[in-house]
């Protein structure tokens, strides 16, 4: 998969991967294994969904047809949730900004229903503190995935 994995003692997760669908699948499997037992099953499923959408967006939109496409992922547990940072060397977001959070229109005939456009609004439904910037040719997306269940202090 061409990745570099760094698991440290405080349950942080850091990984560098090629921007391919196969690498995304393998990354999601590693994340599921790493965080199983550390967060609830619901939180784990949400983390996997949000990261699948995020990383697949990198593969499909930021690094299409780029053999050197690369992404890195850093997940840091903190009070109240998981702080996630995704970096990639792909194309910038359109107009250098986050896309709109709205869902595509579905009040149309079946033949005219959109095939895509649901991933980004889905991400926005589950995360907080969503931030995007581009520095030195690198896209940096940050978000907090809040815990949905109470924790013992």
Question: Which stretches of residues belong to each language-model region?
Answer:
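Conserved short strand/loop->alpha-helix "switch" segment adjacent to the catalytic nucleotide/phosphoryl-transfer site
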Residues: 28-52, 56, 112-113
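Bulky hydrophobic/aromatic packing residues
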Residues: 25-28, 47, 54, 66, ...
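Conserved beta-strand-loop-beta-strand hairpin that lines the nucleotide-binding pocket
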Residues: 1-14, 59-153
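Helix-loop-beta hinge of the Bergerat
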Residues: 8-42
């Amino acid at each position: 998969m061409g990745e570099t994995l760094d698991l440290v003692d405080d349950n942080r997760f850091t990984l560098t991967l090629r921007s391919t669908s196969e690498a995304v699948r393998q990354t999601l499997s590693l994340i599921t294994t790493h965080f199983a037992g550390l967060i609830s099953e619901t939180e784990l499923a949400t983390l996997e969904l949000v990261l699948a959408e995020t990383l697949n967006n990198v593969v499909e939109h930021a690094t299409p047809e780029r053999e050197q496409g690369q992404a890195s992922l850093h997940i840091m547990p903190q009070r109240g949730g998981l702080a996630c940072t995704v970096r990639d060397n792909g194309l910038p977001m359109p107009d250098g900004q986050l896309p709109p959070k709205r869902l595509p229109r579905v009040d149309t005939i079946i033949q005219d229903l959109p095939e895509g456009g649901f991933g980004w609004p889905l991400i926005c439904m589950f995360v907080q503190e969503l931030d995007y910037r581009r520095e030195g040719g690198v896209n940096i997306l940050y978000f907090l995935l809040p815990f949905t269940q109470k924790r013992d202090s």
